[in-house]
Amino acid sequence: MGSGMKSKGVHQISNNIVTALKEYFNDRIEGFTIYNITDIPYPMFSIRFTLYNYYKIVYNYDRGRNGFSISIGRDGIGLKHSQPWFDDIDLGVLCKELDENVRIRIPDKYLAYYNW
Protein backbone atom coordinates (compact mmCIF):
# COMPACT_ATOMS: atom_id res chain seq x y z
CA MET A 1 0.00 0.00 0.00
CA GLY A 2 3.13 2.15 0.22
CA SER A 3 3.54 5.68 -1.03
CA GLY A 4 0.60 7.94 -1.56
CA MET A 5 -1.48 6.39 1.18
CA LYS A 6 -0.85 9.36 3.48
CA SER A 7 -2.57 11.68 0.99
CA LYS A 8 -5.85 9.74 1.38
CA GLY A 9 -6.55 11.33 4.75
CA VAL A 10 -6.68 9.87 8.21
CA HIS A 11 -10.18 8.40 7.89
CA GLN A 12 -9.21 6.35 4.83
CA ILE A 13 -5.87 5.34 6.37
CA SER A 14 -7.51 4.21 9.62
CA ASN A 15 -10.13 2.23 7.68
CA ASN A 16 -7.41 0.57 5.58
CA ILE A 17 -5.52 -0.45 8.71
CA VAL A 18 -8.64 -1.88 10.38
CA THR A 19 -9.46 -3.82 7.20
CA ALA A 20 -5.92 -5.22 6.96
CA LEU A 21 -5.96 -6.25 10.63
CA LYS A 22 -9.37 -7.96 10.26
CA GLU A 23 -8.24 -9.83 7.14
CA TYR A 24 -4.99 -11.00 8.75
CA PHE A 25 -6.26 -11.93 12.22
CA ASN A 26 -9.86 -13.02 11.44
CA ASP A 27 -11.43 -14.36 14.66
CA ARG A 28 -8.34 -13.51 16.73
CA ILE A 29 -9.13 -9.78 16.77
CA GLU A 30 -12.13 -7.74 17.99
CA GLY A 31 -13.40 -4.54 19.56
CA PHE A 32 -12.02 -1.81 17.30
CA THR A 33 -12.22 1.79 18.52
CA ILE A 34 -10.79 4.63 16.43
CA TYR A 35 -10.17 7.78 18.48
CA ASN A 36 -8.12 11.00 18.72
CA ILE A 37 -8.62 11.41 14.98
CA THR A 38 -7.66 14.73 13.40
CA ASP A 39 -6.33 16.13 10.13
CA ILE A 40 -5.53 19.61 11.48
CA PRO A 41 -2.98 20.84 12.47
CA TYR A 42 -1.49 17.51 11.40
CA PRO A 43 -2.80 14.00 10.71
CA MET A 44 -3.03 11.68 13.70
CA PHE A 45 -5.28 8.98 15.15
CA SER A 46 -5.26 5.91 17.36
CA ILE A 47 -6.94 2.52 17.05
CA ARG A 48 -7.57 0.30 20.07
CA PHE A 49 -8.49 -3.38 19.75
CA THR A 50 -8.22 -6.73 21.52
CA LEU A 51 -5.92 -9.37 20.07
CA TYR A 52 -6.16 -13.09 20.90
CA ASN A 53 -8.71 -12.17 23.59
CA TYR A 54 -5.58 -11.56 25.66
CA TYR A 55 -4.08 -8.11 25.06
CA LYS A 56 -5.47 -4.65 24.42
CA ILE A 57 -3.38 -3.23 21.58
CA VAL A 58 -3.11 0.41 20.53
CA TYR A 59 -1.99 1.51 17.07
CA ASN A 60 -0.87 5.14 16.81
CA TYR A 61 -0.41 7.21 13.66
CA ASP A 62 1.16 10.64 14.09
CA ARG A 63 2.36 12.71 11.13
CA GLY A 64 3.35 9.64 9.13
CA ARG A 65 5.04 7.77 11.95
CA ASN A 66 3.23 4.70 13.22
CA GLY A 67 3.48 1.86 15.71
CA PHE A 68 1.79 -0.55 18.10
CA SER A 69 1.86 -0.92 21.85
CA ILE A 70 0.34 -3.28 24.39
CA SER A 71 -1.93 -1.24 26.64
CA ILE A 72 -1.34 -1.68 30.37
CA GLY A 73 -3.54 0.80 32.18
CA ARG A 74 -2.40 4.30 31.28
CA ASP A 75 0.95 3.00 30.05
CA GLY A 76 1.97 0.92 27.08
CA ILE A 77 4.74 -1.41 26.03
CA GLY A 78 6.00 -0.46 22.58
CA LEU A 79 6.25 -3.23 20.00
CA LYS A 80 9.14 -3.03 17.56
CA HIS A 81 8.55 -3.32 13.84
CA SER A 82 10.47 -2.67 10.64
CA GLN A 83 8.20 0.03 9.18
CA PRO A 84 8.06 3.14 11.37
CA TRP A 85 7.08 5.43 8.46
CA PHE A 86 3.66 4.92 6.92
CA ASP A 87 4.63 6.12 3.42
CA ASP A 88 6.74 2.98 2.95
CA ILE A 89 4.41 0.55 4.70
CA ASP A 90 3.42 -2.95 3.69
CA LEU A 91 0.36 -3.72 5.81
CA GLY A 92 0.89 -7.48 5.43
CA VAL A 93 4.38 -7.21 6.92
CA LEU A 94 3.10 -4.88 9.65
CA CYS A 95 0.42 -7.41 10.66
CA LYS A 96 2.90 -10.32 10.57
CA GLU A 97 5.34 -8.46 12.83
CA LEU A 98 2.53 -7.52 15.23
CA ASP A 99 1.45 -11.17 15.34
CA GLU A 100 4.99 -12.35 16.11
CA ASN A 101 5.49 -9.70 18.81
CA VAL A 102 2.23 -10.54 20.56
CA ARG A 103 2.27 -14.35 20.24
CA ILE A 104 5.70 -14.61 21.86
CA ARG A 105 4.21 -13.03 25.00
CA ILE A 106 1.17 -15.34 25.25
CA PRO A 107 1.50 -18.79 26.88
CA ASP A 108 1.51 -21.66 24.37
CA LYS A 109 -1.21 -23.52 26.32
CA TYR A 110 -3.55 -20.55 25.91
CA LEU A 111 -2.96 -20.37 22.14
CA ALA A 112 -3.34 -24.17 21.81
CA TYR A 113 -6.62 -24.15 23.74
CA TYR A 114 -8.14 -21.83 21.11
CA ASN A 115 -6.34 -23.57 18.20
CA TRP A 116 -4.37 -20.42 17.42
Range-by-range predicted roles:
Residues G2-I13, G76-W116:
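Mixed-charge, Lys/Arg-enriched low-complexity segments
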